[in-house]
C-alpha cells in the first residue's frame, strides 16, 4: 500500500483491493520512512558528556581547528555552530568524555541517501537510494520499513498453489535453530511451501557463466569485469560510475538462474526467493524477472511467518534423505564478501591452471565506492 501523510484522511481499507491480487508487485519506492515512528536522531553530533573532569591540560581545546571548544564552569563546552564534527577532540580526551554520534540509518547508508526533513525526521533521497535495506535493519526504532508480499504469498498457500522456496545460502547464519538443511526444509514445508531448493545451485551455474564471460571479454574487450549478483551494488555502480557500467557482467543472478531452472521443471509452479537483502525485491520487480520470481521474502519476514504459524523448530521431524546437498561449497560461499569473485577465479583456475586472475572485494557499498 502507498504511504500517506499523517494529516491525510482516507478509509482504512482504501487501496486494499488493488493490493490483494496474487501477482501484485511493488510500487516504488520500496523502502519508506514511517515518519511518526522516527525519533528525529541528530544527523551528526559531537558532545561533551558528564564524564568531563575539567583537566588543566584540556587537549580537546588545543586540537580543535575551529576553536569551537571553550571552558565554562569547570568543564569543556562545544559550540555546535562552529563545530565541524571532525572528531579530533574525541580522540585526545584522556577520559573518553567526548562522544561522537551519528543517526544510525544515515551511518549505515553507503550511498549518503538519508538526510533530515523540515522537522528533523529521516528522509530518503530516492535519486541516490539503491534499496539495499541497510537503513532498515539499523534503525533502533523500527521506523524504516520495506514493502512485502507476505499477504500475496499466504493467498497462494490458501489456494493450494505449488510454491517453491528458493533459499539463499546465508540462511545458516540467520537461523541457528535451522542450521541443518533438512530442518530448514521441514520448517518451510510446515508453513506451506511445496518444496525447497538451494539458490546456491543457481550460484554454481552463475559461476560457470561468469567465468566464460571473463575469458571472452578480459582483457581483449574489457580491462576488468565486475560481478553482477547484488542488485544494490549493480545499481550503485551504474549510477555513480556510468562509464564503468559496461564492465559489469551481464550474467543472470543465482536467484534468476534457480527460478528459471525450477520453472522449466514445473511450469505451473510459483517461485518464492528467500534471502537477507531487501534489494532482491527490487530485482524481482523488473519486467525481465517478474515471470521467473513470483515472491520475495526477507529472512525477517520468513521468521515472522514461522512464528505466526506456531512452528516449533525443535520438534520438527527431519528426514536427512531430503536434506539439500546439490550445491557446491563455492556456491554457498556467494554470501560472503568476495565470495562470487573467488568462485569465478577458482573456476577459471580449474580450466586454465596457468592463468593468474587477480580479484578485489569490498564490504558494503561505501567501500565499493572507494
Identify the residue ranges that each predicted region occupies:
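Ferredoxin-type iron-sulfur electron-transfer modules and their immediate structural context
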Residues: 1-92, 96-108, 368
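Conserved Radical SAM active-site core
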Residues: 79-80, 85, 93-95, 104-166, ...
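Gly-rich Lys/Arg/Thr-decorated short loops/hinges at beta-loop-alpha junctions or inter-strand turns
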Residues: 39-47, 70-75, 115-116, 134, ...
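Local cysteine-cluster metal-coordination motifs and their immediate loop/turn environment
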Residues: 50-66, 84-95, 106-111, 127-141, ...
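Charged, low-complexity surface patches
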Residues: 53, 82, 98, 128, ...
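Immediate flanking context of iron-sulfur cluster ligation sites
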Residues: 43-47, 127-129, 266-274
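Iron-sulfur-associated redox domains of electron-transfer enzymes in respiratory
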Residues: 1, 146-370
